[in-house]
Regions:
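Donor/substrate-binding cores of folate-linked one-carbon enzymes
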Residues: 2-132, 136-137, 141
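Carbohydrate-active catalytic/glycan-binding domains of CAZyme proteins
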Residues: 131-427
Length: 427
């Protein structure tokens, strides 16, 4: 940790001295970078771009990114995501400065928050602190007993109808009444979306083969307390998931996640529900969780972009005047660099005149929980949302993850993950 800049140099440049701080300054001031998150078991590691003041790590925060802490004892390994994710911060803010002026940067700066760190200033850990931390960690490694039964994380769907919707349940949501849907032997189901067709309700979902670890898209009719036998509707030589299914005009479309292919592809239904033709490659990028919202003649695309698998994921917003038209990036992009809400968790929906975007929290681990965020402002120039309801896996015994939500009318469907013996779910 270098010495603090003081005096006239801080105001020598018109817009001050910009500096990275590799931790969340609401909890960590000082250093070493992204070490104390590991030490304290914090699931979130941060990075920020600030305008320096004479107070250590207390300047105006122009931009902040929050990433999942990488478990273990390697500080350098834990630095990879924050370093990589923040690599574009300066360029993004310089672009905004050029296009919109300094007042815009001040207006969009992270609001000041009270410091909540356990230490006033963090410094290089002492030998005794390292011993207190590493001793138990190394002891657990030495005493670790091999697991007799191999375990897998098994995803399933759960459905309910007639109960108050999750979005109406307030800060302590009630998820009682959900019925679990068992997957076929050797497979797991996740990422459910629902859509009506005539007087029938259907769900489309990710259907993964344990043996190949490759997903396809399957669908089933939603019936009282369950679903019909699933039918595969879209299968490729690469992994498919997150089937964002929707209607535009008189046509039914789907945008499945195909991140391993590196494209965002649009499919049109030519025979509902089981025949789909490729309509167009909408976007070429390593994208996940693409979710569409159509409103007032505009097509909005929420897309989580990542340069490398699992590194530096950011939520970007694009618009187009036609479904297959050219995408225009929103001037506020990226609209989130927070690992707790920058990945889609289901269809955007309107309820009681309010617009909601489900997002998943990947802080503790991928797909840990989901939040329903109310979209307060959505136009060509501004985007703003606020969290309303968060569902964590504690809603059902044994769950370690729940990351997708969909509802049509009073019917709701979610997914959930629990560790189970591999033999119990594989062929």
């Amino acid at each position: 940790m270098g010495s603090i800049l003081r005096g006239e140099i801080l105001t020598a440049a018109k817009y001050g001295v910009w500096s990275y701080h590799h931790s969340d300054n609401q909890y960590y001031r000082g250093g070493p970078a992204n070490f104390w998150e590991l030490y304290e078991g914090n699931p979130i590691s941060g990075v920020m771009l600030q305008v320096l003041t004479e107070e250590l790590d207390a300047g105006k925060v122009l931009y902040k990114g929050l990433f999942a802490t990488r478990p273990g004892i390697s500080r350098m390994r834990n630095c990879v995501q924050p370093y990589w994710g923040a690599s574009t911060f300066v360029i993004q803010k310089l672009r905004e400065l050029h296009q919109h002026g300094w007042e815009h940067l001040e207006r969009t700066a992270v609001p000041p928050a009270a410091y909540l760190g356990k230490k006033k200033i963090y410094t290089v850990p002492s030998n005794s602190e390292m011993l207190r931390w590493l001793g138990p960690v190394l002891l657990r490694k030495v005493l670790r007993v091999p697991v007799c039964r191999p375990m897998v994380e098994h995803w399933r769907l759960a459905i309910r109808s007639g109960a108050p919707l999750v979005v109406d349940s307030g800060p302590t949501p009630d998820l009682s009444g959900f019925h679990w849907i068992e997957s076929m032997k050797g497979r797991f189901y996740a990422d459910p979306f629902m859509i009506e067709d005539g007087d029938k309700l259907w769900t489309f979902f990710e259907d993964v083969d344990y043996e190949t670890q490759r997903g396809r898209i399957s669908c089933a009719e939603v019936q009282k307390g369950g679903i019909s036998n699933p039918v595969p509707v879209l299968e490729m030589p690469y992994h498919l998931s997150y089937p964002c299914v929707f209607r535009a005009g008189n046509e039914t479309y789907m945008i499945p996640e195909s991140g391993s292919k590196g494209t965002v592809d649009l499919y049109r239904c030519v025979r509902f529900p089981d025949k789909w033709d490729m309509e167009k490659e909408l976007f070429r990028a390593p994208a996940v969780g693409t979710t569409i919202w159509i409103d007032d003649g505009l097509y909005w695309f929420f897309v989580s972009l990542e340069e490398l698998r699992g590194l530096g994921t950011q939520l970007w917003l694009f618009s187009a005047t036609t479904l297959t038209g050219e995408w225009t990036p929103h001037p506020g992009n990226p609209i989130s660099t927070d690992v707790r809400n920058n990945r889609g968790a289901g269809a955007v929906f309107r309820h009681d005149g309010k617009l909601f975007r489900p997002s998943q929290d990947c802080g503790k681990h991928e797909g840990y929980s989901f939040t329903l965020n109310q979209i307060v402002t959505l136009d060509r120039y501004q985007y703003q949302e606020k969290p309303c309801v968060t569902i964590n896996p504690l809603w059902a015994p044994g769950l370690v993850g729940t990351h997708t939500y969909s509802h049509v009318g009073q019917v709701e469907i979610v997914d959930g993950c629990e560790p189970v013996p591999a033999r119990s779910v594989r062929d």
